[in-house]
Amino acid sequence: MFVFRVLNTVPYTNRTGAKDLVASIHSFLTSNLLVGLAVLISWKQFGGTPIECMVPLDFTSAWVQYSNNYCWAQPTYFIPFTEELVEQVVDPADVVADGITIGNGGNRPRFVKKGGEKISYYQWMSFFLLFEAACFRLPCFIWKYFASQSGMQVGEILRVASDENNAVPLVKKANIDALCIHLRGVLRFQKRLKLKKIVPHKILRFLNIKYSAYYVTFIYFVAKVAFLLNVILQSKLLNKYMLPHDRQQNFGFDMWKTIFYGSTNGNETWRENGVFPRVTLCDFETRDMGNVQMHTVQCVLLLNLFTEKIFVFLWAWYILLTAFTVGNLFSWLFAVFNETYNEHFILNHLEMCETPFDKDDLKNREHVTRFITLYLGTDGLFLLQLIAQHADVVFTTELIAALFKTYIEIEAQRATLKQMNAVLPLLRPNDESQVESGKNTAPSTSHNVRRRGTEQLEKNVKSRQGSLSTQLRPFNSFEEPDQPTKKFDDSSSEDENSKKGSKKPSPTKKKASSKNSPQSSSNSRRPSLAHTASPAFTHHHEPDSKIPKTAEKKHW
């Protein structure tokens, strides 16, 4: 937004990265707005003339300055212009607490000044606004402090996700890989800690909540509730500080109604109700020739003109901010804890990625459900939704696709390990007789048994992977393309074995071998029967007729 860009140019007002729109409005826009209003009020208070009093004509300039300073430092009071300044006390025995006796002679009635409502909030207005600005910053500090204690560096993750250099393909790919590695490590740590079932973590679960898989989400909602409670509390303080009477609690609503309708419509103005009065009264004493004289002067509070407008604006702003915060809180509760919404969030992003993906397939939906519950968890899913708000849709889609590819690889490894665990007990001796018979057998026989068991295990694993690939048919394109297999020539190994196992040939044999050299060289290039039957070579070798000699020489 334009307002955020402008405020970012002002020192000490820059935003932190790990915040959403509501947090930015509370801790960034509102707090800076309150600071600006406090500066405006302070400039009027200390740099201008906040109050001007009408003094008697015999006052010198020094007495005028004194009366202005005194009435600014001391609270003033307000009496409506429709009422008399003095009133008669019927019973002379009455004690007047806030009045000054004018006539007092015997049993004659006394007249006293009315002690109107004391007004002193304008003296502390700038400090009150600064206090409110600090309160609006507090929930963000709570989120920043406690979220930094988790393994997920939320601020750094959002900074990388919203980096402007992600428009460069290489930079975007590097950032996605870095985020995948970081998230994979954090999620693996949380899963491993949960499987260990540490006793202190189970007993003192509340004190060890930062080790749980929902810690970041919990702190985020605590900050949301803190934002809501803060704006409600600030609204109450604003009314209590500036509107002392309960009958004036609808003053903000009446003022906005007056602004919209263009007239008071029967509402009281400051002349009647005394809310933000422009004219007040001030009493002070002077000594003249040893005698104490009481003076009552009438003062003009120009500062209340600004204070009234600030109150009306803040009253409406807090109402809108409360409604917006409540709506945002319930929307996040729905987004995090609604399973259907979470599944559609992942399915829609997987459907938008480059890999063909059918979100209506039941198998795909099952994998997405397992991906959310077993792999991401509450914090992982919440962080992806937070990234979706900060980063662009292309970056978010590719990041979710990369994490889903990692999940598919982990599922394939888990299926392979289950198959191996099912086959390995078949290769172990069941009783002591088999152990003794295994010891008495020849080494070649035991080697053949192990080799056959290994071949059977590899066949079972390959068949299991084949069945898994057919089940995960839409996700095959996540895998890297098959690299061309290298052709290995086993002639050198056969020659070395033949040299080691045989003696030096006779001269006649050398001649015979030299005559048959082309045939022998061609035969030496072909793998032996043992190598052909070995499972380690059957995957790489092809018939020799398909391999040209030039390619062999170039390879070697």
From Swiss-Prot:
Superkingdom field: Eukaryota
Regions that span the bilayer: 21-41, 127-147, 213-233, 310-330
Name of the molecule in the record: Innexin-7
Source organism phylogeny: Eukaryota, Metazoa, Ecdysozoa, Nematoda, Chromadorea
Bias (Low complexity) ranges: 514-527
Glycosylation sites: 267
Chain residue ranges for the region called Disordered: 431-556
One Gene Ontology term from the biological process aspect of the record: monoatomic ion transmembrane transport
Job of this protein: Structural component of the gap junctions.
